[in-house]
Amino acid sequence: METILRYVIIAAVGALASILANQSIAVFNDGLRPVLPEYLEKRMDRKALAATSFAIGFGLVIGYGLPTSIAASIILIHCILLTTDIIGTWCPDTKKGMIASGVIGAVYGVALLFGLQVIIDLFNLLPVNFLGSLGQVSAGITLAFAIFPAVTVALQFGAAKGIITAVVTLLVRQIVETYGKIALDAEHTISLNKDGMALLAGMIIMLVFAAMDKEGNDQNSNEMLTQIFADKVARIRKYMPVLALMGGLIAAGTSMSIMAGDPISQGLLAEGDRVNAGLTALARAIGFIPLVATTAITTGVYAPAGMTFVFVIGLLIPNPFIALIAGAACICVEILLLNVIAKGLDKFPGIKRCGDNIRTAMSYVIDIALLIGGILAAQAIMPTTGLFIIVAFWCINKCSKKPLVSMAVGPLGAILVGLIANVLFLLSLYTPAA
């Protein structure tokens, strides 16, 4: 009976997470979440979104998630949710596409639980296995996203204030990187996420400048205030029941030792040390609050595991049915708190004028982050030659009558480099470095 329940839970997690990604409600990849508004607001087509999702997620699945899962015999959540991001975005944004994504996600979840090693072995058959290198594509997105408030300030209030915001953002990041570990006791520490804290600092400064914007203080402006952040959270709140179910399923799966949220708690859970695994997961979740909350508020897209407290619940509650209920309640509380934060942000004068600049700044940042990530991945696959191909791809795309959107060039270029590397290897024209 327990074995059947395990397969039911993993299938449900895979199916629902794929559907959430397909409908652009929630994605797990922190690097993909800021990209989704580009698709939702029609600045990116479905093909470019699918290619970006694959490029920034699949390498992490193969190079990080699967090997770690095999070592512990417990699935690292990245294996499931990074792949469901890809499944969801690759299926059409239609009713049939939604159903297809759910079916494929369920099958993938069951297959993942059934045999992890087979998947890795298949990709190891490639002459040049470049999938691990594709993880470089998303290496800078989370970091780069932290600078978008500074770009917004520069666009709206001038370069000088933008520089001030950028400098403070950088200082906060470095301070957290240096002093961001808070010891709970001799064995446990809370490690604050430096990029999340930097993003939070930048947003606070952006809101301070917006509050000081006199043009936004008149009565008519306030009456016509566009609820930018509240509208984003309202979109998340609309889907709160299905997000709650998603959180509950993840908590139940963690409770049954099917999955874990990070390698440290995964290892402790494999050893049967649920309490320390829970404390470790709690410390990680606290550190990631700013990153998940701020990206949710600014994009209108949530994470399937929320702020990751559902893993703590699953680890500390051994009964999967109770964990299911508690996990669902946890996600509801998180979303309600997001709404409170968003309504508070909307009261700041000047936010209305920030709207277009926020969107423009996010596009700027993601464009350059994905291009640099593509270059890093290409260089990892084929040093120097990879850079040549990416630059050529970028320039030729610019000259095309129907160019690809800029943010798709880096990820697609990295995939192209990987394919070219394998073809050249078969033609005896390329030998990868040892």
Report the location of each language-model feature.
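Glycine-rich, N-terminal phosphate-binding loop and its surrounding beta-alpha-beta segment
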Residues: 55-90
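Conserved structured catalytic cores and adjacent interaction surfaces
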Residues: 304-308
